[in-house]
């Protein structure tokens, strides 16, 4: 798919497939194209090129069928200010009377510690977010599309939201959520896509992505470091303190460890990359053109 707003490219030919029954994280900073992608999937805006299907339905020609099966939480959540929370959920329930489940609704409200008796205009950002989450989860949709779902929530409620999403996936439903809170994505996602300046630069299972991504290694040699070590493909020196070298290995550690094994080593430490390390590696890639680097900021 591709989408531009005037001279600004929001999406540049992205190709993305999400398997059903999984929790899929969509990563990128503000302005990278996450929200534009979500809006196209829900037919809230139209792409300039390309097509998309959700649950087997064409996003444009069969958008009503898509929406019947999707629970959506927008990043710019807007609610009916004059309604109470319970009135708003009654309103949402009225669109899907066959899926009304008062017991499940009460459970969601209790778990998120939400007061439904107050007018929406009087709710804090966090409580509005809770209400938005309840309406998205309410009818147990086949697919949850959530744009920054834990925004404005305190850590205790964030943990409860994570449990709700894990339960949804455990029931065979799909969770597609965008976020820039990397520890949260790492904690619950099975797969992730990283979008940069409107392009998908990585799509992979979280464990595989981390395993073949950057490792930070610190080695203290008994003698000066071998000159060939830092010449290995994918090895980038960070700093050197006498016989101790700190460097990054971007193409796995096998070749690096073999080179180190030919020397007398006094100390060796390696740090398994977090998802944040992986993400930052993509966003600090020196091969990224300057215009794209600015666009993704």
Which residues fall in each region the model found?
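Conserved catalytic motifs of ABC-family nucleotide-binding domains
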Residues: 140
